[in-house]
């Protein structure tokens, strides 16, 4: 069994970019400042999977100064990473905590789990998504950004 941890954070920006979380478009008046689509959930999962498999981090594999990753759908990046890992491991579970004040995502969590499970070709019951507010504290609490943390357990096959 191998365990990996991932984290990602993006600030909300003035330039509107759709808010994508776990591969799902979430209606909101703000988007994130990012090179790719800025999907903090997928980015934290990618880093946790890379950590569990000792394959580095998202910034090394997909540098933010490479034009081919400009506005790329992060689900594509997740599939690329999983294709490197799936020969040796299967998903034990993935646990994600999203930190944000708004929008509320509870009505989207099942759809997010389904999207992630489709990318990873695993069952939805091994993926957990939850969100926490920052109670008005810090930049996220002031609605200036969004962050995600993920822990992945990989099992050798």
UniProtKB/Swiss-Prot annotation:
UniProt KW keywords: Isoprene biosynthesis, Lyase, Metal-binding
Names of required cofactors: a divalent metal cation
GO biological process, one term: terpenoid biosynthetic process
Record field: catalytic activity: 4-CDP-2-C-methyl-D-erythritol 2-phosphate = 2-C-methyl-D-erythritol 2,4-cyclic diphosphate + CMP
Residues given in the record as a divalent metal cation binding sites: 8, 10, 43
Cofactor comment text: Binds 1 divalent metal cation per subunit.
Pathway: Isoprenoid biosynthesis; isopentenyl diphosphate biosynthesis via DXP pathway; isopentenyl diphosphate from 1-deoxy-D-xylulose 5-phosphate: step 4/6
PANTHER family in the record: 2-C-METHYL-D-ERYTHRITOL 2,4-CYCLODIPHOSPHATE SYNTHASE, CHLOROPLASTIC
Protein name as annotated: 2-C-methyl-D-erythritol 2,4-cyclodiphosphate synthase
Organism: Wigglesworthia glossinidia brevipalpis
């Amino acid at each position: 069994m191998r365990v990996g941890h991932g984290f990602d954070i993006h600030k909300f920006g003035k330039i509107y970019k759709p808010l994508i979380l776990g591969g799902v478009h979430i209606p909101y008046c703000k988007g994130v400042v990012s090179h790719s689509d800025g999907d903090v959930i997928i980015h934290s999962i990618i880093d946790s999977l890379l950590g569990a498999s000792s394959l580095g981090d998202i910034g090394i594999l997909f540098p933010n100064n490479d034009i081919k990753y400009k506005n790329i759908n992060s689900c594509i990046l997740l599939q690329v990473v999983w294709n490197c890992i799936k020969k040796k491991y299967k998903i034990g579970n993935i646990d994600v905590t999203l930190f944000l004040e708004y929008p509320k995502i509870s009505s989207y969590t099942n759809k997010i789990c389904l999207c992630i499970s489709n990318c990873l070709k695993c069952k939805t019951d091994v993926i957990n998504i939850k969100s926490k507010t920052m109670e008005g504290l810090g930049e996220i609490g002031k609605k200036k950004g969004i962050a995600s943390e993920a822990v992945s357990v990989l099992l050798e096959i």
